[in-house]
Amino acid sequence: MKGVENTLSQSESVNRGYNGWMGMESETSARATHSSEQMISLEEYVREMLPMHLQKLLMERIIEAEQTGAAHTSVFAAPTGVAAQYPAMGPPMLPGQTFSSRSFAEGLVVGQLSVIVVLIFFIKFFIFSDGPAKTGGGGGSSAESRSSGFTGSPLTSTTSRLLSTLIKRGGKEGTEFAEDSENERTRQINAILEKTYYDVETHSPESLDWFNVLIAQTIQKFREEALQKDNIVHSLNDFISRKSSQLPNYLDAVKITELDIGDDFPIFSNCRIKYSPPLNKKRLEAKIDIDLSDRLTLGIETRLLMNYPKYLTASLPVKLTVSMLRFQACLTVSLTTAEEFVPTMAATTDTDAGDSEGHYLVFSFSPDYRMEFDIKSLIGARSKLENIPKISSLVEYQIKKWFMDRCVEPRFQFVKLPSMWPRSKNTREEKSDMQEEDPSRAPE
């Protein structure tokens, strides 16, 4: 009730002020009709009379508020009258009204931070996570890999499943091909032969003339570099110096006296694709006939040291020249992975274990190969013994034994294939005519 009375008193005071102003205005207009000298302009009224009326109205408002004791209630009451016309003169904003905007800003910041943390966690542990530990040759390392598999395998398997769903082959999901792992390799071989229109049983052998041209160009480049920079001579001398500690004590230092790298090229022919017999049609291999008729010569000299009855009692000079004249064989080439073959050495180094990943080009020669030599020997200083048959047969046997232990079936050599994905560091550009004339000029 007090609030209503205060509101009524406010409206009455405003009305009184308005009536007083209207009365003064009518009185002023009356005076203006009687005498133009006593006329008060609007500017003078706003400057002199209006402040007095407003001050009087304000004093009455303060006195009434003190009398009723409801000054606090009247200030925060609902806006009516003048307060309704001027909202800026209403009650001040309470601290509780700013709480909603502040809490919204804090919630927005916390939400953004939580999303960033989740993204960082996902990228670190699902995208850039390390693979499972490599399994060593011993039983202890395999046990460790099995024990560590409980922590690493779920994460890597989840990542692999996530990425495998993105890869498709021929419009089909990649997981469809990985489910049947037993027949997967056979299915791939059959698909390759079918889509390339190649029948292993009836397809005629190929001549490989284009391949002979490429191989001839490569060998020619090697020969030019060997003649210009003596790379082969330096390599052989370095090899002999490294192996000098393994020579028996009755041999002196070995020196190279002659080197002939030939001028002919190997001829590859009669290429045919066959199934690899040990794997039951799970791998393809290419069989190529190779024929080389050239003269590749290496001449060395050394001394036989006579250390009995005293050290360096006498020495016997020895000169040996070995020339390969003919080589014929059937070359077998295939692609494989490291899991499909067993190393011949029992112990492997860390670098060999790191190279066991990826794909390899495997090649070997058939046991019925043909290798012809021309071996010349000269022993002695004054009374010389020349071309002893026993020495020739011994040298030829050692060369063939070295070759069979490394390149003849069932032994083979493998070469790791590089990554075939295009990379910026492997990108080159052909030189223009201006750059060939001036090699120092770089392209703009």
UniProtKB/Swiss-Prot annotation:
Keywords: Endoplasmic reticulum, Lipid transport, Lipid-binding, Membrane, Transmembrane, Transmembrane helix, Transport. Residues 1-20, 136-157, 425-444 are annotated as: Disordered. Disulfide bonds: none annotated. Residues 1-16 have a biased composition (Polar residues). The chain crosses the membrane at residues 108-128. GO terms for biological process: aminophospholipid transport; mitochondrial genome maintenance; mitochondrial outer membrane translocase complex assembly; mitochondrion-endoplasmic reticulum membrane tethering; protein insertion into mitochondrial outer membrane. Residues 129-444 are cytoplasmic. It is a single-pass type I membrane protein. Residues 1-107 are lumenal. InterPro entries: Mmm1, MMM1_dom, SMP_LBD. Residues 142-157 have a biased composition (Low complexity). The keyword Endoplasmic reticulum applies. GO terms for cellular component: endoplasmic reticulum; endoplasmic reticulum membrane; ERMES complex. It holds the Pfam family MMM1. Residues 204-418 form the SMP-LTD domain. Residues 426-444 have a biased composition (Basic and acidic residues). One of its GO terms (molecular function) is lipid binding. It is found in: Endoplasmic reticulum membrane. PANTHER family: SMP-LTD DOMAIN-CONTAINING PROTEIN, TEX2 PROTEIN-RELATED. Component of the ERMES/MDM complex, which serves as a molecular tether to connect the endoplasmic reticulum (ER) and mitochondria. Components of this complex are involved in the control of mitochondrial shape and protein biogenesis, and function in nonvesicular lipid trafficking between the ER and mitochondria. The MDM12-MMM1 subcomplex functions in the major beta-barrel assembly pathway that is responsible for biogenesis of all outer membrane beta-barrel proteins, and acts in a late step after the SAM complex. The SMP-LTD domain is a barrel-like domain that can bind various types of glycerophospholipids in its interior and mediate their transfer between two adjacent bilayers. Homodimer. Component of the ER-mitochondria encounter structure (ERMES) or MDM complex, composed of MMM1, MDM10, MDM12 and MDM34. A MMM1 homodimer associates with one molecule of MDM12 on each side in a pairwise head-to-tail manner, and the SMP-LTD domains of MMM1 and MDM12 generate a continuous hydrophobic tunnel for phospholipid trafficking. Belongs to the MMM1 family. This is Maintenance of mitochondrial morphology protein 1. It comes from Eremothecium gossypii (strain ATCC 10895 / CBS 109.51 / FGSC 9923 / NRRL Y-1056).
